[in-house]
């Protein structure tokens, strides 16, 4: 017997549950489920199986679907707080639903998806199931009003995108009243779909809540920085494609200083100039049109290289976007003002329980364990995999690769119209292939980040006989290509990667479009030495004829180099954001205290506290308290405090970004940039808190018509330990 009889009686699918312990690929994970082997079942265990049984029954009733064994196994993995690696077409939607039904009585469950379309689709599909199980369910989308969002966030089970959840969290922590907040329940459990895309690929880019900034930097200065960089000789710069950095050589440093009339470019009073030059260098040499970004209707739109889609509404902060606009001779938009920011890594840490699903997590198992303490469990496929994965074809030039591609296309057409999915490594490459196919009179469709609005329609037809779709990595995730006719099913989908991606996971996601649920299919990658993948090599060993040595630099080897670099980058992002994390918690807790002050006694007490900390004298304190008791309402005092605190916090974050931008140069002097940043952030945070209190006191004195002013604050180093959460309790 594999489970206690009493527990088995609570479910109509004992074979499915028992099967869990028989799968050899999951043996190492069996200890997570020892609680189910108890001779005397605990009440919560019986409740878990009762919930599972109810969920299966309602799915059968309302959807006419019966969950596979593997989906139930996946649900147990998610419920235990791990990552379930499930291949394309294996039913992650029902797996997440079963997990939510099993765990929603413990606390709210958020099912986090990568886009509104998936969130809405799954919400509408499963709403009757959840309600039949006794749970309320909500949907949060970008287009909703705050009132509708607030209502949705009160539900037991909530569907929401990762971006919307993150921005709602940031907006709540910049709200000017408690009523304006939309997330009102504790962050209990998150089930993250495409967990590697959210916690790995997006981890390097913080979520930034921006407001309208002021024109602190003139257009002329952006243009001057760009013109200075354009004038640099090759010997004046050092590019590292592996780390995506560009730095000035000593000669380049001297050239820029002379051209701009600066004595020391990296002196404290030249930090803005250095920042502008650094951004201009990156814009010129690392940000490429139709690869990192595209230009649409006179605007720069950023491309997610891992996902191939335009990142709607996302702009680089800290002046890099303006540097690109100067480079492209576009209208330079005002730099946004950062109101609040957080990484997805630290957003995930706010939940008591997190788990996730994806088709490709095993290669990043170490990072999931190190950064999130999440184990990755591979779930077997329901049907045997029938896809044939061919060895890579290697070519010296992209022209040779294109010629081979045309031969594959001709053969597919001759065999009866085998559907082809051709995925290029960039928008630029996909558009070039489309022009080639047009010249060759090959009927095809093109889908890139430029026209992703028609994605659903194009993907829907990609599994039809005779279909040839040229696209990018955007077809590799969040799409399900179904074979639509008997001939297509007989031949199977053929996935052709033109160039390897920056990560093996991207390639595996692409391969996974073929061979879903036991379908026939094939995949192959055509790789050349001219591909973007090989731009990361820094001084590679060459043959006598000056070509890259394939034996030393296989695509797999180069991908591992990139993945190692990306891991270090994500870890670095987290380390720097951790410096801000404790400070952010202090500020958010302080804002909560301000928002929760409800009466005039709180106003006077809090004003008195601020005044003492801002070094006011006894007469000032007495005059201030007397004036406030007669002239200031609680609502107005809250508004004053919040406006000053938020404005100063925004300026503080901007200053830290400038400091962080120049930290890499500290390593040249044998110093540790992270330690330097921690020390300077600690110092400036103490000064920020003192100056904020002073600014609030000055505002209160002005309102109270008090003639005296607070004493000038002393500048001092402030230990981070002095500003823990306990300080404001």
Identify the function of each model-found stretch.
Residues 2-3, 7-544, 588-589:
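Conserved P-loop NTPase motor core
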Residues 294, 298-301, 313-314, 537-539, ...:
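Extended, charged helical/alpha-beta scaffold domains that provide interaction surfaces
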